[in-house]
């Protein structure tokens, strides 16, 4: 089996929320905040193959599905789908993935399942050959919020 750390879209989130009770004077050395106190966070997925003959992706990150105004609001840095670029760099496409495992269905973990935003286009699910795996409680909560 081979494992790849696959880079996805990055996002900027409030540094105080991310570092909890650690003083800003400490964490800003490692992660300088912007004018809104947001720090850049990388989103990474894990690709494993073969796992019982399957290509498995763990997590999908935030992706590039937001329209520009929402992309800015949620601090998504790139306007392209970095996860797809990174899969390609590892020699794979989203069509090659047999199984996608998600820890939960928040948009910053599952947004990468959608194609990049296009003006006037309906959302499009990627990974057409994959079986999606998520815990039953998370699935039911998404179905019945």
Language model region names:
Residues 55, 61-145:
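Active-site HxH/HxHxD metal-binding segment of metal-dependent hydrolases
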């Amino acid at each position: 089996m081979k494992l790849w750390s696959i880079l996805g879209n990055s996002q900027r989130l409030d540094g105080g929320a991310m570092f909890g009770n650690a003083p800003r004077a400490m964490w800003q050395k490692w992660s300088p905040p912007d004018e809104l106190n947001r720090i850049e966070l990388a989103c990474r997925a894990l690709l494993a193959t073969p796992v019982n003959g399957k290509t498995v992706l763990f997590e999908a990150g935030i992706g590039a599905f937001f329209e520009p105004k929402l992309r800015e609001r949620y601090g998504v840095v790139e306007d392209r789908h970095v996860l797809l670029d990174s899969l390609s760099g590892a020699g794979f496409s989203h069509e090659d993935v047999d199984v996608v495992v998600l820890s939960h269905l928040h948009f910053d973990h599952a947004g990468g399942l959608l194609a990049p935003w296009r003006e006037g286009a309906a959302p499009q699910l990627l990974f057409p050959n994959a079986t999606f795996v998520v815990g039953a409680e998370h699935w039911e909560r998404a179905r019945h919020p």
